[in-house]
From Swiss-Prot:
Lineage per the UniProt record: Archaea, Nanobdellota, Candidatus Nanoarchaeia, Nanoarchaeales, Nanoarchaeaceae
Keyword hit for Ribonucleoprotein: no
Protein name: Inorganic pyrophosphatase
One GO MF term attached to the UniProt entry: magnesium ion binding
Annotated substrate binding sites: K16, R28, Y40, Y126
Native organism: Nanoarchaeum equitans (strain Kin4-M)
Function: Catalyzes the hydrolysis of inorganic pyrophosphate (PPi) forming two phosphate ions.
Length: 160
């Protein structure tokens, strides 16, 4: 499966941007000394149970420009729970034509353990200093589950 990801936050940023009404706006500057370990955004034309598009974390060596689209393939999903309920984040890599290194990865099980630890650590801590907010990391799931979640979110989008 290949989909496009819309990048809101570049790798290495501590500024949380959100795309709203056709514009990229600053949502907030992260409260703690944290920065996004990889590029973060959403998969267009998807809808999660929380009413937002499906979140995606795109693993690359380089930060991508906010507002850009990149063709990716899902390799897994990070399941978290926050103050609003279950929050799933698709973990994706660019397709091989775009990134010949990460493009070879097919499943989250192929990611180096250090990459998964970095992702887990970030999402466990990035809301820690924000009043009334929290995140609990539940588990990583593989490519098949990620693809099921994307297909369901695409169906949800079509039904709205």
């Amino acid at each position: 499966m290949e989909v496009y990801a819309f990048i809101e936050v570049p790798k290495g940023s501590n500024v949380k941007y959100e795309y709203e009404d056709g514009k990229l706006k600053v949502d907030r500057i992260l409260y703690g000394a944290m920065f996004y370990p990889y590029n973060y955004g959403f998969i267009p034309e998807t809808l999660e149970e929380d009413g937002d598009p499906l979140d995606v974390l795109v693993i690359t060596e380089e930060p991508l420009v906010p507002g850009s689209y990149i063709k990716v393939k899902p390799i897994g999903v990070l399941v978290t729970e926050d103050e609003k309920g279950v929050d799933r984040k698709i973990i994706a890599v660019p397709v091989k034509k775009v990134d010949p290194i990460y493009g070879e990865i097919e499943d989250i099980s192929e990611l180096k353990e250090g990459i998964k630890l970095k992702i887990k650590h970030f999402f466990e801590r990035y809301k820690e200093l924000e009043p009334g907010k929290f995140v609990k990391v539940k588990e990583f799931l593989g490519k098949e589950e990620a693809e099921k979640i994307i297909k369901q979110a695409q169906e949800n989008y079509k039904k709205q």
